[in-house]
């Protein structure tokens, strides 16, 4: 927000905040991560609505699992989701396209959009159990 007032005066500029698909539900074993990403999403969408007529573009990027070192640092295998991982370059490309179109939110990748939609249809308790199962399987994986 340091430069937001200057952008508003110029009626141009932009903010891109990186959140996560994890911002849309609590993730067992990654509670702090999903909670902090929920804050980023809520904060960014709130800013967007406050300043939508200011000429400043504000975008919240919510990628799902992406091919990065995150899994290594989290001591978790990416094998259970290997076929669904996007490259960071794909995430950036999609995000910049969304930004250039003036969108305020992007959930990167079709599988991630489906996952968000699907989890909104099922009871929270099921969604939590499903997340726990997927994450636990990745944490238990020995060959990564």
Regions found by a protein language model. Name each.
Residues 20:
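Residue(s) in the substrate-gating loop at a strand-loop-helix junction
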Residues 50-114, 125:
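SDR active-site lid
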Residues 36:
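Active-site helix of classical SDR
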Residues 1, 45:
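A short, exposed helix-loop element centered on a Lys and neighboring polar residues
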Residues 27-31:
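Active-site loop immediately N-terminal to the catalytic Tyr-X3-Lys motif
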Residues 2-11:
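A short helix-coil junction within the Rossmann-fold of NAD(P)-dependent oxidoreductases
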Residues 17:
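Rossmann-fold scaffold of SDR-type NAD(P)-dependent oxidoreductases
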Residues 6-7, 25, 46-57:
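Active-site-adjacent segment of SDR/Rossmann-fold oxidoreductases
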């Amino acid at each position: 927000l340091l430069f937001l007032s200057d952008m508003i005066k110029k009626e141009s500029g932009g903010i891109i905040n990186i959140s996560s698909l994890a911002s849309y539900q609590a993730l067992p074993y990654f509670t702090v991560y999903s909670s902090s990403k929920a804050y980023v999403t809520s904060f960014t969408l709130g800013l967007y609505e406050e300043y939508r007529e200011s000429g400043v573009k504000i975008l919240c990027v919510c990628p799902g699992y992406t091919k990065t070192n995150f899994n290594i640092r989290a001591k978790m295998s990416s094998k259970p989701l290997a076929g669904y991982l996007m490259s960071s370059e794909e995430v950036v490309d999609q995000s910049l396209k969304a930004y250039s179109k003036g969108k305020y939110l992007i959930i990167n990748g079709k599988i991630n959009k489906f996952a968000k939609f699907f989890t909104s249809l099922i009871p929270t308790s099921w969604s939590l159990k499903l997340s726990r199962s997927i994450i636990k399987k990745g944490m238990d994986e020995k060959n990564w």
